[in-house]
């Protein structure tokens, strides 16, 4: 399973408003967002790039998981066409669905809010998709 991994800011008792200081508009609504300047204000000038680094890293991991998800789905389609037994097909579908749930958590939750935890969750998605491919490549 996935171990609880509190965000780094949790340890210093910082809530959303500690980082989301920049006033902005989103779909006509006033919102507060995180900004590189906010990171640098509390830390160092080098921390200005932290948010973009986190976004890039999480984005790359999500992209990788999505690509593996497609491979798992393609393997499932091929297994169905080859006439694999219904138990194997059902198991593969369950593993793909589990992987999709983990992937969706990070997509919806915006992984930069807790990068370490997001990567841990995405690891579970990767495992489910890889296990599906292995199951179907082994012939069930």
PLM-predicted stretches and their roles:
Residues 65-79, 102:
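Non-transmembrane amphipathic alpha-helical segments
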Residues 82-125, 129:
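Amphipathic, non-membrane alpha-helical rod segments
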Residues 1-63, 67, 85, 105-120, ...:
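Inter-heme linker and motif-flanking segments adjacent to c-type heme-binding CXXCH motifs
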Residues 61-68, 91-97:
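Short amphipathic alpha-helical heptad-repeat segments
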